[in-house]
Amino acid sequence: MASQGTKRSYEQMETGGDRQNATEIRASVGRMVSGIGRFYIQMCTELKLSDYEGRLIQNSITIERMVLSAFDERRNKYLEEHPSAGKDPKKTGGPIYRRRDGKWMRELILYDKEEIRRIWRQANNGEDATAGLTHLMIWHSNLNDATYQRTRALVRTGMDPRMCSLMQGSTLPRRSGAAGAAVKGVGTMVMELIRMIKRGINDRNFWRGENGRRTRIAYERMCNILKGKFQTAAQRAMMDQVRESRNPGNAEIEDLIFLARSALILRGSVAHKSCLPACVYGLAVASGYDFEREGYSLVGIDPFRLLQNSQVFSLIRPNENPAHKSQLVWMACHSAAFEDLRVSSFIRGTRVVPRGQLSTRGVQIASNENMETMDSSTLELRSRYWAIRTRSGGNTNQQRASAGQISVQPTFSVQRNLPFERATIMAAFTGNTEGRTSDMRTEIIRMMESARSEDVSFQGRGVFELSDEKATNPIVPSFDMSNEGSYFFGDNAEEYDN
């Protein structure tokens, strides 16, 4: 993968930079997060938030959403052209929670988008700092991935709800650029493409005229992004077929669903980045930490170290378990919603439980929830070890894909086997190997059948002590081979509704 020479690292995508050396990358990522931090501090001043209120993750999310909305040009233009009752297209806002007489109060605030844009630019040396905005989008996306299930979205596009581990980044907005594309799972890309093809089937003008030409370019670009995620020649060849199709229809949808299923074993490369809430960067900047001088990386020790020293609070509903709320946010911070629970538990140093066993709902609080009974507690976001985030699917020895699990997309580069039920997955591949992609389908099925769940992925890779910032002594954990590691097992989470 890395030998292609044209690949930019995530940090380059993240900061919109061209090829840079490691020091420059660390500096530009540092510049990006310190801009987020400075913006957050300024917003806390504007809103007169106390130190405690500024550390409340719900307030952080509201402030993040405000700046994302202020810069959402396409939506802003749409809102101005289609005025809806009670929505001022020039304003943005949300709930801010304040502590009053021992109780939490909700206050709805409203700001001019222009004013928010001014504060953001001022915090980012007068620039638009799109990279910082994308970073916030990815943090929200990672939080959604850990919190909600996408069963309905999967079923609607004709995919199997058990393919949830392929859905990383499914709630990312389209404007999230290259950094956003890098973190999208195979299932997310397939779903976007299927939606597009279905529109083309239902609307004859979709591919026609000047607009249709732009649509076609977008379609081919999405196909290429997905192709780049696959690691075997047969999967890539099938993507070429889908991309080159004269007018994409049901045959292409079939091929895409086939490819998505195959990705449960022949996993795609999906990037993982630790994107933290704005308040965490704000706290660090306020305490005098110079991100740009020190440098920062989203895939190394830095986010772990930052979380070791940050105290973040969260509102807790009456029957929620604060430890479970902490787990949810920890997973979101490290983009670990689709990681093997054995690996996450080892790194975190406390047991990470499947979502079906969590007594907690999402982090955000609906406007109709009763604030009288709300409490708050400290989120435990520290870890026992740290590990390097991966951008590969953990397939063993390059071109040959290894065992995958019906619900794992590795986040950490740590040696483990990837347990999976081959029977369950292979059952989805009965029959249909005819048509123009038959030889590729046969080849893909052959590779999947030869995969063994005893195979070890990320051979020799381990976790590191938090004192080992240069990653010199890997500690290779040994896992119980038989143990199931799926977060979505026995799931009862809410659906994601936009």
From Swiss-Prot:
GO cellular component: helical viral capsid; host cell; host cell nucleus; ribonucleoprotein complex; viral nucleocapsid
GO biological process: symbiont entry into host cell; viral penetration into host nucleus
InterPro entries linked to this entry: Flu_NP
Keywords (A to Z) from UniProt: Capsid protein, Helical capsid protein, Host nucleus, Host-virus interaction, Ribonucleoprotein, RNA-binding, Viral nucleoprotein, Viral penetration into host nucleus, Virion, Virus entry into host cell
GO MF entry, a single one: structural molecule activity
Intervals of motif Unconventional nuclear localization signal: 1-18
Subcellular location: Virion; Host nucleus
Record-annotated disulphide pairs: none
PTM (free text): Late in virus-infected cells, may be cleaved from a 56-kDa protein to a 53-kDa protein by a cellular caspase. This cleavage might be a marker for the onset of apoptosis in infected cells or have a specific function in virus host interaction.
Annotated stretches, region: Disordered: 1-21
Main location: virion
Family: Belongs to the influenza viruses nucleoprotein family.
Function statement: Encapsidates the negative strand viral RNA, protecting it from nucleases. The encapsidated genomic RNA is termed the ribonucleoprotein (RNP) and serves as template for transcription and replication. The RNP needs to be localized in the host nucleus to start an infectious cycle, but is too large to diffuse through the nuclear pore complex. NP comprises at least 2 nuclear localization signals that are responsible for the active RNP import into the nucleus through cellular importin alpha/beta pathway.
Binding partners and assembly: Homomultimerizes to form the nucleocapsid. May bind host exportin-1/XPO1. Binds to viral genomic RNA. Protein-RNA contacts are mediated by a combination of electrostatic interactions between positively charged residues and the phosphate backbone and planar interactions between aromatic side chains and bases.
The protein's name in its UniProt record: Nucleoprotein
Encoding gene per record: NP
